[in-house]
UniProtKB/Swiss-Prot annotation:
This is NADH-quinone oxidoreductase subunit I. SUPFAM superfamilies: 4Fe-4S ferredoxins (SSF54862). [4Fe-4S] cluster 2 binds at C61, C90, C93, C96. It is an enzyme of class 7 (translocase). Belongs to the complex I 23 kDa subunit family. InterPro entries: 4Fe4S_Fe-S-bd (IPR017896), 4Fe4S_Fe_S_CS (IPR017900), NADH_quinone_OxRdtase_chainI (IPR010226). GO terms for biological process: aerobic respiration. It comes from the Bacteria. Residues 41-71, 81-110 form the 4Fe-4S ferredoxin-type domain. Binds 2 [4Fe-4S] clusters per subunit. Its cofactor is [4Fe-4S] cluster. It comes from Shewanella woodyi (strain ATCC 51908 / MS32).
Length: 171
């Protein structure tokens, strides 16, 4: 009898408390500024695509949802001919963003990607590219990478030191 009364008191107490759930379409839940959502491809400050098609993002992806096909431009740089992400498989882990050496891949707090057809969740490079630099405004990979381009040798680019002779470090 005592346990039944205790149960009834607990039920009545929870009946008049405020609900913890949020009615999603009407009230948007708070998402932190660092929330990992949809993936975008950014451009450097000059307006060029940052992706150099190194395939590190597709190797780092635990569910294998990123596919990159690369080509080589006239000046010797690599670029992504096609960059495909299957968001129906993506778990938004952020490993691709961490693996990207050029900061081309960035995760945004956009989470509303619901679709009726699964094929609509396969995004190509044209859908992923944004016009701005994203989080890293002044970063330009080819100004700090050490790759010889357009007649400049290694160590002659902006803010770059000349290469170290590895043989001089040997005992």
């Amino acid at each position: 009898m005592l346990s039944q009364i205790r149960t009834l008191i607990t039920i009545l107490k929870h009946t008049f408390t405020r609900a913890d759930t949020v009615e999603y379409p009407e009230q948007k839940p708070y998402l932190s500024p660092r929330y990992r959502g949809r993936i975008v491809l950014t451009r450097d400050p000059d307006g060029e695509e940052r992706c150099v098609a190194c395939n590190l993002c597709s190797v780092a992806c635990p569910v294998d949802c990123i596919s990159v096909v690369k080509t080589e431009k006239e000046d010797g740089r690599w670029e992504a001919e096609s960059f495909t992400i299957n968001f129906s498989r993506c778990i938004m882990c952020g490993f691709c963003e961490e693996a990207c050496p050029t900061h081309a891949i960035q995760l945004t707090p956009d989470v509303e990607m619901a679709e009726y057809d699964r094929q609509n969740l396969v995004f190509e490079k044209e859908h992923l590219l944004i016009s701005g630099p994203g989080k890293y405004h002044d970063y330009n990979f080819y100004k700090v990478s050490g790759k010889a381009i357009n007649g400049k040798g290694k160590g002659e680019a902006h803010n770059e030191q000349s290469p170290i002779n590895v043989r001089s470090l040997l005992p």
